[in-house]
């Protein structure tokens, strides 16, 4: 913290301020409880299987996982990680699934039941293809997910050059309206095609589908998306799940996270990750900024200084 002169400096002042603030409010922040309604399913078996038998030298399991998580982060959606052996799928309204290449029938049936009961799934390509032993299923893909997904496929291909989607169906602009790396030749049964390839051969099959199954929906990505396209798909899924709101309307540099304190009060953390001032309209119940001790009312304009934060505790 101190430089070679051992004198207080800018960094020392920052650390001092942080320590003072933590001393003042820290006891009310410990044991923070999160109630996220979005989960990301992480499969270490799928990670290793795809590493062992890669489908591309540019994209792998981690690439898609990071893309999906990054999109949710930019959308200000709080995310939990769940795993194939997790038993709490019903705690969530939306589960996002990177390529679930390795999965037993029981897991895929649990995901289908999650949708049937009113949950929403966003599932990446190659999911449901192999069983728990990384052996390709002797059935049409995506195996036990077929009914919930509303389609099947028997063929797939590598795409060496990006392909555009026909007609910019998600309204993201020409630069981001393209896919690459992988294409599954999806044959819809009950699923709706959200987007098709703009190509004389691949255009026969949808790139993105959505199926209503029971009380929920399953959105499927049969190809590798651009970051903006992934973000738009996940924003649509948040809307379907009833989870989109004012947090998704904040400026790109403002992040917000929520929790419940050990005193049972709702906390809202707003962080400005930019060198310019940011102003937003506070949408939650009236409270107090724990750092400035100023009252903050619902619908009040709140200003964040560069690289600053507001920590609002509801009354």
Task: Cite the ranges covered by each PLM segment.
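Carbohydrate-binding surfaces of carbohydrate-active enzymes
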Residues: 1-315
């Amino acid at each position: 913290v101190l430089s070679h002169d051992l004198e207080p400096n800018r960094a020392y002042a920052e650390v001092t301020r942080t320590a003072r603030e933590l001393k003042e409010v820290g006891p009310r922040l410990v044991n923070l409880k999160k109630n996220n309604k979005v989960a990301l399913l992480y499969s270490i078996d799928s990670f290793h299987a795809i590493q062992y038998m890669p489908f591309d030298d540019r994209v792998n399991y981690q690439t898609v996982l990071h893309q999906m998580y990054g999109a949710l982060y930019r959308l200000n959606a709080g995310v939990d990680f769940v795993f194939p052996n997790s038993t709490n799928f019903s705690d969530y309204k939306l589960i996002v699934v990177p390529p679930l290449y390795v999965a037993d029938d029981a897991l895929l049936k649990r995901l289908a039941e999650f949708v049937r009961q009113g949950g929403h799934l966003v599932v990446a390509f190659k999911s449901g293809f192999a069983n728990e032993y990384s052996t390709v299923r002797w059935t049409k893909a995506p195996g036990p997910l077929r009914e919930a997904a509303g389609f099947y496929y028997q063929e797939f291909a590598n795409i060496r050059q990006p392909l555009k989607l026909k007609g910019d169906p998600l309204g993201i602009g020409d630069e981001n309206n393209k896919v690459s790396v992988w294409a599954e030749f999806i044959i819809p049964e009950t699923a709706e095609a959200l987007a098709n390839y703009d190509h004389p051969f691949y255009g026969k099959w949808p790139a993105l589908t959505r199926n209503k199954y029971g009380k929920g929906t399953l959105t499927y990505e049969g190809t590798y998306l651009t970051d903006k396209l992934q973000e738009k798909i996940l924003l649509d899924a948040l809307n379907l799940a009833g989870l989109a709101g004012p947090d998704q309307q904040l400026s790109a540099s403002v992040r917000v996270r929520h929790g419940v304190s050990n005193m049972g009060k709702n906390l809202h953390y707003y962080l400005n990750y930019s060198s310019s001032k940011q102003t937003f309209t506070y949408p939650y119940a009236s409270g107090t900024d724990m750092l400035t001790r100023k009252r903050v009312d619902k619908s009040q304009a709140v200003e964040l200084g560069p690289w600053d934060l507001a920590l609002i505790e509801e009354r």
